[in-house]
Amino acid sequence: MNESPRASYGSTGAHPGYDPVLVIDFGAQYAQLIARRVRECHVYSEIVPWDMPVAEILARRPAALILSGGPKSVYSPGAPRVDPALFAAGVPVLGICYGHQVMAQALDGTVARTGTAEYGATRLRVDDPGVLFDGLPTSQQVWMSHGDSVTAAPPGFRVTASTPSTPVAAFEDPTRRLYGVQFHPEVVHSERGMDVLRHFLLVGAGCRPSWTMINIVEEAVTAVRAQVGNGRLICGLSGGVDSAVAAALVQRAVGDTLTCVFVDHGLLRAGEAEQVERDFVASTGVDLVHVKAADRFASALAGVTDPEQKRKIIGREFIRVFEESARELDARAEAEGTHIGFLVQGTLYPDVIESGSPTAAKIKSHHNVGGLPDDLQFDLVEPLRTLFKDEVRRLGEELGLPEDIVWRQPFPGPGLAVRIIGEVTPERLEIVRAADAVVRDEIRRAGLDREIWQVFAVLLADVRSVGVQGDERTYGFPVVLRAVTSEDAMTADWARLPYDLLERISNRVVNEVGQVNRVVYDITSKPPGTIEWE
């Protein structure tokens, strides 16, 4: 791990009571998934770049290291390398896929281009249970994705598993606490992958499973109190789970010194504005300012069809409305002899990773609160910035938030405006809102609302489709049904919904939603498509 310029990863600077497991990222699509799986074993984890110097890694006092997979071959020009000093530091290490190979190469094993690649589900034969496979079946399905293979383990290692095409599918040196697997234990297709990770963390590395929701809540409350003291705070509620959980957590820490501003832009799904005003306040007791600005946003969006322009307009208006509310609240606070000094932000750990934010992170643009004037600059309070989405949901449950808020599916900041392909008008909003309500109701009735990452309706407002309804020829709008499964929204697959469910959704939409005479199902994955249409 050299001193070359490296990718910017945001350091969370949090949880000093935990010695983290550091996931060293070699450019893997699964790096975040590995970190999440570690946390599912109740062990705290963070992601760092592959070229972080060894001294900097060790300064973080890691309990263990996991070397991720990556898209390169170890023989590619400029391929990431590992400083062998890392393996002499006495820290337990697990190499996964590319990490397995780069460990072997650094410690004088052999990595070869065998000409036989493995992709997808593969049968693994356990030849020696060792630490990783102790108590597990001798034959199990694993998920492979590699071209090169380790053909000889480094000196001092013993081979513990193989496949028909990979003679060294796993190895270990328990004396030095070094382990490697060619497969991906973090993906669900590896049948006993979580057991392998758990064995490494709890047995091989001796980590303590102390990363629990109760501890997270207690620690976050303490941290917020220490940061803000007696200061006053403001939070922009979007109606989504992130801002709701952030506000609820801060409310528990500081009570009535927090005021939440809910900017209702008129672009939410059916019943959401009422739910925020009723259920969120009832469950938290938070001081809520509900700004009803639907007419203002509708006027600003009139005649606009370009999706980027929609986003910019909505972001601009959101900032202006929030700014006006913040000024009013700050003036009221000053009249009482206080001042609003803090802004609560629902930043999550993936945002920190992707933005490379330092500890004082910038406001997320998709939360539509960025770009506030100089005289309204607040110190940021980001109580969720070390958490993944699934952890935020569990935290919301721990805080007693209503299930409908905690398990609300991801929703774009511009709301239904980007689910109308064409100009946004009040009439079209009612159409897509009604269609979306039918879709979500049927998915909920089918018991699939937690299995599907996102499901929604899109209105093709600039398209007219010919149809026959009541023996009359019609020209109505087509509605697109979009349903995807995903782990983290970085990639997504279209959901294989049952035909009878698709039929019920289609029948209800064309019969209950005016001006719609056709429903189509989008079967595009991400990539090449995106989850949203705009």
Swiss-Prot record:
PROSITE patterns (UniProt xref): GATASE_TYPE_1, GMPS_ATP_PPASE
UniProt xrefs under CDD domains: GATase1_GMP_Synthase, GMP_synthase_C
Keyword Membrane: no
Keyword Ligase: yes
InterPro entries in alphabetical order: Class_I_gatase-like, GATASE, GMP_synth_C, GMP_synth_GATase, GMP_synthase, GMPS_ATP_PPase_dom, NAD/GMP_synthase, Rossmann-like_a/b/a_fold
EC number: 6.3.5.2
Active site as annotated: 97 (nucleophile), 184, 186
Catalyzed reaction equations: XMP + L-glutamine + ATP + H2O = GMP + L-glutamate + AMP + diphosphate + 2 H(+)
Positions of the Glutamine amidotransferase type-1 domain: 20-210
PANTHER family according to UniProt: GMP SYNTHASE [GLUTAMINE-HYDROLYZING] (PTHR11922:SF2), GMP SYNTHASE-RELATED (PTHR11922)
NCBIfam families hit by this protein: guaA_Cterm, guaA_Nterm, PRK00074.1
Subunit details: Homodimer.
Name of this protein: GMP synthase [glutamine-hydrolyzing]
Source organism of this protein record: Parafrankia sp. (strain EAN1pec)
Gene this chain is encoded by: guaA
